[in-house]
Amino acid sequence: MAAPASAYKDRQFLAVIGDEDSVTGLLLAGIGHVTSPPDSQKNFLVVDNKTDNAAIEEAFERFTTERKDIGILLINQHIAERIRHRVDTYTAAFPALLEIPSKDHPYDPEKDSVLRRVRRLFGE
């Protein structure tokens, strides 16, 4: 059953949690957005080896729960692995969660939480 229009009508932005190259490319493509003051929240998080998993989880929570203007959340698959317990338990329709490859880490369909759910659904 489709979600009511009220669930998605204000969700007009993408958010990204990724490495520097992925985030930079998406920002150059025009997805960057900062909310109005006083909180001025960005719709992206650049993750490197020094980024704590807690910071990644906090951004994931903010983009999926707190921000009602995010329609799609893109996350590098190798970063999703760092918070796999949160990604695997995420079931909301909005924002849609998509795992994407990065320059240094190719996409592995065996790790993708959405594809695993589809396989379970079809009994594979």
Swiss-Prot record:
It holds the Pfam family ATP-synt_F. Keywords: Hydrogen ion transport, Ion transport, Membrane, Transport, Vacuole. GO terms for cellular component: fungal-type vacuole membrane; vacuolar proton-transporting V-type ATPase, V1 domain. One of its GO terms (molecular function) is proton-transporting ATPase activity, rotational mechanism. The keyword Cell cycle does not apply. InterPro entries: ATPase_V1-cplx_f_g_su, ATPase_V1-cplx_fsu_euk, ATPase_V1_fsu_sf. It is found in: Vacuole membrane. It is a peripheral membrane protein. The keyword Ion transport applies. Its main location: membrane. It comes from the Eukaryota. V-ATPase is a heteromultimeric enzyme composed of a peripheral catalytic V1 complex (components A to H) attached to an integral membrane V0 proton pore complex (components: a, c, c', c'', d, e, f and VOA1). Subunit of the V1 complex of vacuolar(H+)-ATPase (V-ATPase), a multisubunit enzyme composed of a peripheral complex (V1) that hydrolyzes ATP and a membrane integral complex (V0) that translocates protons. V-ATPase is responsible for acidifying and maintaining the pH of intracellular compartments. Belongs to the V-ATPase F subunit family. NCBIfam families: V_ATP_synt_F (TIGR01101). This is V-type proton ATPase subunit F. It comes from Botryotinia fuckeliana (strain B05.10).
